[in-house]
């Protein structure tokens, strides 16, 4: 389906449910897409960090994306991560995603290798010119060790290379500078790239990003509570910033589930992704909360903590 320009609203990065042998659990994934659509989301982002894309084989990636596209059924656009180290490998993923029916692509800067901003620009231009789908840049320096400069993003937005940005840098100052470059809170639609989408990946500061002029959010926690993020977005759209802030504060408290796994026992990604999947299992959406190896599973004590946080947020577990 055609993307709105700019893409806006709540676009969760879809978790990839796994079976007991690590296979993609397509039945759970189909239920998850239904859960997200029932929550009112405006799009779906498959094969991102929250999808555990770095752990998935090419076959698993294809199965997950195919399942999301089929379950979405054209009701909302599906963005597909084409995440890999260098341009030729990203192009392979991009071609596969296009063949499976994705509506847009999401790619990071090259990583493992060290690249100059001009090389990063060439990377995105090659992707856009080779695969005819809208392209979103994914700014996640903690994973790729390169921060996309606001000047570079604005350049690629203005020349039509990029349809949007998913900003997971955590650098709120850089995000604000980019928004100002693009016309500021009230001048975006008449600025240098009126159809360019700026999406924050910082689920704890969505109200602030929307107030600054961002178009939407890509929240990992949105897997668990999509309706909450939609309420936040709708309140901001209506200019009801008090209601938006109240919803944001409830979601901040719920986000504490990501620390359910002790730091002495597992990585922070293992804890966060495990908590999202555990929450979805407790809510009856996923058959299990399995994460990809070698991430460690949450202990029973941690699972109980996730359940307590869900109840406190008004999302009582059914398991």
Regions found by a protein language model. Give the residues of each.
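Actinobacteria-biased recognition of intrinsically disordered, low-complexity terminal regions
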Residues: 1, 189-190, 319
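Active-site beta->alpha loop and helix N-cap motifs at the rims of alpha/beta catalytic domains
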Residues: 2-147, 295-296, 316
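C-terminal alpha-helical cap/extension of soluble enzyme domains
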Residues: 6, 11-17, 39, 225-319
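Short, flexible micro-motifs
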Residues: 12, 25, 46, 51-54, ...
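Short, amphipathic alpha-helical "lid/cap" segments that border enzyme active or binding sites
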Residues: 26-33, 150, 300-310
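A general structural signal for well-ordered alpha-helical segments in protein cores
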Residues: 29, 61, 65, 90, ...
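Alpha-helical structural signal in soluble globular domains
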Residues: 39, 63, 67-72, 96, ...
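Catalytic alpha/beta core domains of metabolic enzymes, predominantly
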Residues: 129, 141-260
């Amino acid at each position: 389906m055609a993307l709105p320009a700019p893409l806006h609203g709540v676009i969760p990065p879809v978790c990839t449910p796994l079976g007991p042998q690590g296979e993609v659990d397509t039945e759970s994934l189909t239920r998850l897409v239904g859960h997200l659509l029932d929550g009112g989301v405006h799009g779906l982002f498959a094969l991102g960090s929250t999808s555990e894309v770095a752990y998935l084989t090419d076959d698993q990636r294809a199965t997950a994306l195919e399942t999301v596209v089929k379950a979405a059924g054209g009701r909302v656009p599906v963005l597909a991560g084409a995440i890999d180290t260098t341009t030729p490998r990203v192009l392979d993923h991009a071609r596969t995603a296009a063949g499976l029916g994705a509506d847009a692509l999401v790619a990071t800067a090259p990583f493992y290798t060290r690249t100059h901003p001009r090389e990063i620009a060439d990377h995105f231009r090659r992707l856009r010119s080779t695969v005819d789908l809208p392209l979103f840049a994914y700014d996640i320096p903690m994973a790729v060790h390169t921060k996309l400069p606001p000047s570079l993003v604005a350049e690629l937005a203005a020349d039509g290379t990029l349809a949007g940005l998913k900003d997971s840098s955590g650098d709120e100052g850089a995000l604000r500078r980019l928004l100002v470059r693009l016309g500021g809170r009230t001048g975006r639609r008449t600025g240098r790239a009126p159809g360019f989408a700026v999406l924050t990946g910082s689920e704890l500061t969505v109200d602030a990003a929307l107030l600054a002029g961002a178009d939407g959010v890509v929240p990992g926690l949105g897997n668990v509570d999509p309706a909450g993020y939609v309420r936040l977005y709708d309140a901001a759209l209506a200019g009801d910033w008090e209601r938006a802030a109240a919803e944001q504060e409830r979601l901040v408290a719920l986000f504490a589930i990501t620390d359910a796994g002790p730091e002495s026992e597992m990585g922070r990604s293992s804890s966060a992704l495990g908590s999202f999947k555990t929450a979805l299992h407790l809510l009856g959406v996923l058959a299990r909360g399995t994460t990809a190896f070698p991430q460690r599973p949450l202990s029973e004590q941690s699972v109980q903590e996730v359940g307590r946080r869900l109840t406190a947020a008004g999302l009582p577990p059914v398991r």
